Design a protein with these regions (language model features):
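A solvent-exposed interaction/effector surface
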Residues: 1-175
Length: 175
């Protein structure tokens, strides 16, 4: 699984999210709970209706607050500005960065199929990135930038569902 290296300009994301504490280990459970709420309350449709983004695609990202151990997890869409954002939404300005873009292996999530395999493929892709790809690559993780997951039309009830993981990178010193 080789990534594509891209330079991506900064962009704005608006959507719904939660505050969680990474240091206390609640992060994974809190995000799973948020996803259930997101789907149960049909927040995706509401978000598209209110924000009217120029392109289909959801962005999942985590913005850490290093001093407190807290983080904001946001699931949103890319918008041109924040003029249509409502009080119950969160916003993030994602800065320009160089990214290694990984596309997950395809999974069948067509109608009636369990989504758990897709979730596991996403988790295993993250593991691969940090445990296998980074150590053997000419790159290091750029901790000053944000990573994010991107879910476009290729991840909605298809026999070949995939999504992309954008990991900020910079060239390893002495490469």
């Amino acid at each position: 699984m080789n990534p594509v290296i891209v330079q991506k300009p900064g962009f704005k994301v608006a959507g719904y999210g939660i505050e969680t504490n990474v240091a206390e280990g609640n992060y994974t459970k809190d995000i799973a709970s948020f996803w259930s709420h997101y789907e149960g309350e049909n927040l995706e449709s509401k978000m598209y209706e209110l924000l009217n983004p120029p392109k289909h695609g959801e962005v999942g990202l985590c913005v850490p607050a290093f001093d407190s151990g807290n983080a904001t997890y946001l699931l949103g869409v890319i918008v041109e500005d924040f003029s249509r954002v409502t009080d119950d939404m969160l916003t993030v300005n994602v800065p320009e960065a160089e990214y290694a873009v990984f596309t997950t292996l395809p999974v069948d999530t067509s109608e009636g199929k369990d989504q758990e395999e897709f979730v596991q493929v996403i988790k295993s892709t993250w593991r691969y990135i940090f445990e296998e790809w980074f150590p053997g690559s000419g790159y290091v993780y750029d901790e000053g930038r944000l990573n994010f997951e991107y879910y476009d039309e290729r991840c909605h009830s298809r026999a070949d569902t995939v999504m992309e993981i954008y990991v900020p990178v910079r060239e390893r010193a002495g490469k």
